[in-house]
Amino acid sequence: MKEAAPVEGAKATESIDALKVRIRELEKEVDRWKSQVKSVRYGLCWQDVPEAFDKDSEDKIPVLEEVSEKAIDAAGPLAGRPPHVIIEGDNYHALTCLNYTHRGKIDVIYIDPPYNTGSDGFTYKDRRFLTEFPDGQKVPREHPLRHSYWLSFMEKRLKLAKNLLSDRGVIFISIDDNEQANLKLLCDKIFGEGNLLTTFPRKGTGGRQDSKYFAIVHEYIQGYAKRLDKFESGRMAKGKNFPLFDESKNLHYKTQLLRKWGDNSRRENRPNLFYPIYYNTSTKEFSLSKSKNFLEIYPMLDLNNEGCWRWGKKTMEEAFHKGLVEIQKNRKGEWIPYERIYDNPNEESTKPYSSWIDDIDNSTGSSLLKEILQTHDFSYPKPVDLIDRIIRMSSMQKSTVILDFFAGSGTTLHATLNLNKEDGGNRRCILVQQSEGENNICECVTYERNRRVMCGYTSAKGERVEGLGGSLKYYKTGFVGKHPSKNASDADKVELAEKAGCLIALAENTLETVALPKAASGFFQIYSDNAEKKRYTCIYHNGDYERVPEFIDRIDELRKNDKRAKFAVYVFSWNSPDFFENEFDDLTNIEIKAIPKPILEIYKALNG
């Protein structure tokens, strides 16, 4: 018993020391919070929860690695165009890599992040509880940190995304009521309140009954410009804002709900606007008088709540006679009256409208995906027409670069391919998607959907659909070194230089690998684009310079084959590439750059 006392005393001392350490940590946390609260004068304030990542990626340097067997080069109308890109991996790491390859180069970003409904599977890895939840926690609706987790998750990614936008660039974010208000304030903070484009209400996955009082049928798209003074909105062509066609009038038109919505839309608000209209499904006639074989239709908000029409009886009667009313049957079999709004035939195009509440139903995204993949194991894919509209109104240019870093089913690339085919454009699309689920979503849905669109497929109905053609490169995020970028050792820098080939090729938009002897590939790599006027990216990544003469000879050989070709030459150097400049005195159209220092400098800046 006497011998045990010192042991117990030592244990008590250890516990006290651990408690002191924990107290100091909590004091630092309190000080950090006090500082944050003092700095906020107006706007959004939440508990910024530190995020953890997979163990293999912690404290390492992110790179991209090509999966060459997934490359696509398909014949068809879009063959020979610049390649598109899919990146498989956590979008935080992918965005970090893109901050080197595409800073200031992206014209349009569209994302469809988790809505944080409490049941959509949103998972957050709270660094403080990794031992308890190593794979992260699904965030239920009643979780006390539900909104803080989501805001912490989104803020990091949106800050990285902002760096990628060109001066004329724009970002559009799909969201619903769960986080729309928070997202608006977060984007005001990141992009600037003065760069708000608008909040677009749009038709969502209709008729959700999870709300106690209303059947929720709307969502939002939050839009911001990098610099509003540089933004040029594309105008919508006929058939886009007015997607329907009336052969009798030879005019395009769109429809708008005849029942009033929003404020003052209930019967008690406007009793004089609550009355029946009558419709004959055989003759397509309308009437305000009860007649045989005519349906009686009231402006119902839902089965038990009475609404009101937008027009009084006189205006309604006039609209009947002018052919400005039509009836559509919804998925529940209910007959719903709509106003027809006709296009102005004297205008070739029009400004985009800020409300998309009456068109582009989400259900079309599900049906199309099922047609292509012949299976449907993906919830709420966005419709192609929605992304088409966003791209069109984001720019009048046909060579924009588009990014979606919550790619999901890959709709954004599909829409880009369709639009390029329609107008002969050279738009390029980059998709980023995590490898979620037992069946890797990125491989089995994002990639496979677009592989079929490019190469052709047999639909669920057994019909052959010809491919659009085009090319695509597939990458995965990878990691090098044993330290984060700010503490990179010499060994880390050597490994980064050796593994940075795909990053550099993507930055230069030269994604085709030039074949080299196996022995040479351990020292240098060469990439090219697929354009008629060639550009080459040549990378000498080894610290041993014994093969530099062979490297130079290879470049000279390519230059002689095409004297118009341009070359970007990257060389491993601890500081600057001055050592190599004399070696290239006799060669023209060559720019020499050092690696890996510029990559590390960008990564360090991102991590503070």
Where do the protein language model's features map onto the residues?
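Conserved S-adenosyl-L-methionine
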Residues: 46, 53, 135, 151, ...
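Active-site-adjacent "gating/activation" loops or surface patches in catalytic cores
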Residues: 86, 117-133, 345-382
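Signature of N6-adenine DNA methyltransferases within the class I
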Residues: 154, 167-168, 177-242
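PRPP-dependent phosphoribosyltransferase catalytic core
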Residues: 418, 422-608
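Active-site-adjacent helix-turn-beta-strand microarchitecture at beta-sheet edges
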Residues: 19, 25-33, 205, 227-371
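DnaQ-like (DEDDh/DEDDy) 3′-5′ exonuclease domain used for proofreading
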Residues: 1-110, 115-156, 576
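Phosphate/ATP-binding catalytic cores across multiple sugar-kinase/actin-like superfamilies
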Residues: 94, 98-101, 154-158, 164-165, ...
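SAM-dependent methyltransferase catalytic-core segment centered on the flexible catalytic loop
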Residues: 76-77, 92, 101-170, 178, ...
